Amino acid sequence: MPALRVLLRVAAVLVFLAGLVLFVFPLRTADWFAWTVVPPMTAVFLGAAYWSSAVLEAAGARSAGWDRARLAVWPVLVFTTLTLGVTLLHLDRFHLGPEHPPLARTAAWAWLVVYAVVPVAMLAAAALQLRAARSPAGPRSRVAPGLPGGLRLLLGGVAAVLGAAGTVLLAVPARAAVLWPWELTPLTGRAVGAWLVGLGVSAALAGAAGAARTARPVAASALVFVLLQVLALLRHGDALGRSPAATAGLAAVLVAVGVAAVWLLVLGRARPPH
């Protein structure tokens, strides 16, 4: 799957760069990013998601087989497709015009090209890989024991919560934003929603994985996501004052994701029985 590996490597670099601006320089998005992200808590939240995605995509690019690579491919495809839709809905908010700083304008046009090309390229590469995987001559994965029932239940719950929250933010961002711990605009609400749905798909795929070793890239990415979100809250947690219940809900989800990630990593390190 050479084409898929190249695509995942390129995607990993791109999301790392996006995360660099958002997480490290959240106050400079008006000058350096494709669109102005406010408040800074939203920028660092999105930056953490981008950086954690870089971990998953890099692992997918190094995967020897489709069983592990698909755990990166499908979430990326879902997220980029949704984000393209969000971009087109809010195109007037992007720094595409000459009135914006040159770097921000370059970032906006690059964003538009990337999100127009990557979903199509990812779908084409995945289709080729699926065709090769169905070939009788292709290698077959060894059957491995499934995940513990408790872990599957936890991952399923995380997937359901993230997917539902993301879908609501995508569909009715203005109404759903009142239930979020900090202020969201329609654009930032939908941007967060696209990430939540993508993360939910990732959790669902991890829960359906045949073995913990297969799902380790998802676990590593999820743990990075949680740690970066904790750091983001330490830096900009003053933005969370408007809804204690929503803040508690976010904390509960982060704890659940962290527990699932550590559980998967511990199981993945264990030697399979002979």
Task: Describe every region a protein language model picked out.
Residues M41-A58, V78, L187-G207, V224:
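Core segments of alpha-helical transmembrane spans in multipass integral membrane proteins
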Residues M1-P75, T87, A104, L179-P181, ...:
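An N-terminus-focused feature that recognizes amino-terminal "leader" regions
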Residues S52-S135, A232, R242-A270:
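Hydrophobic, ordered structural segments
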Residues L20-L27, G85-P98, L162-V178, L231-A239:
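C-terminal ends of transmembrane alpha-helices
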Residues M1-L20, R131-A209:
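Surface-exposed interaction/gating patches
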Residues L27-W35, F94-L103, A137-S141, A174-E183, ...:
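Membrane-interface helix termini and inter-helical loops of multi-pass transporters
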Residues P75-L88, W195-L199, V218-L234:
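Hydrophobic alpha-helical membrane segments
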